[in-house]
Amino acid sequence: MTVEFSGAVTECVRQMLSDQKYNLILEGTFRTLETPWRITEELKFKGYTAELHAIAVPKDISYVGTLDRYFVGKTKGTGRAVDKRHHDLVAEKLPVHLKALAKSGMFRSMHLHTREREIFSTEHDVEAFMEQFQREVERRLDFAQGNRLAKRIDFVDQALAEEERRGLAAIAETPIAEIRRELQAIKKSRNIGMER
C-alpha cells in the first residue's frame, strides 16, 4: 500500500512540476528499464533536455550502505530496510539498464559519480562511460576507505546484535544469520580485520 501511494504521489508531483517547466532531478535504482525510459521520453516530449547521471559503487559497499542507512535512519524513525535479494537484483540489472539508456541517444550527456564526486562525463562515448563504470564498481579500496568500511560493518554488526536481543530474526525478509555471513564474506574479500 505504501509503495503504491508514494509512487502515485511522486508521479503526480512530477507531472505537475514538469507541466510548469521546473528543472527536475529524478532518481531511481534502474531496477527496471521501463520507468526511466518512459519518464525521459515524456519529459523530452515536453521540451526538456535530459542528462544521465549514475553513481558507481562496488556491490559489497552498496549493500553495507543499505544496512548502515537503515540502522541510522531507524534511530530517527525513518529507517527503510532493503531485502538483500532486491539489492542484488538491482546491482545485477544496473549495468545492463545503464548501458541501454546510455546507448538510447535520449541524453545530452552522461555523468558518472562516486559517492564523493563526479569522475567521468561524456556526450557520446557509451563504451568509455561503461568501461569507467565497470572499473569503479570493481575497484580495490585504499587504506582509508577500507577503514571506513570496517567501521560501518562494525556498526551494522552491533545493530544486528541489538535486533537479535529484541527477538528479531530478519531484516526486510533477509535472515540476520544470512546478513552476518555476507558481512563476514565482505570482510574477508576486502581483507578487513587482517593485515592490509
Q: Which stretches of residues belong to each language-model region?
A:
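Flexible loop/turn segments at secondary-structure boundaries
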Residues: L33-E34, D60, E118-F120
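A generic structural signal for alpha->beta connector loops
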Residues: K21, G47-T49, M106-S109
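Conserved GTP-binding G-domain of TRAFAC-class P-loop NTPases and closely related GTPase folds
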Residues: V64-K187
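Conserved nucleotide-sensing/catalytic segment adjacent to the nucleotide-binding pocket
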Residues: M1-E42
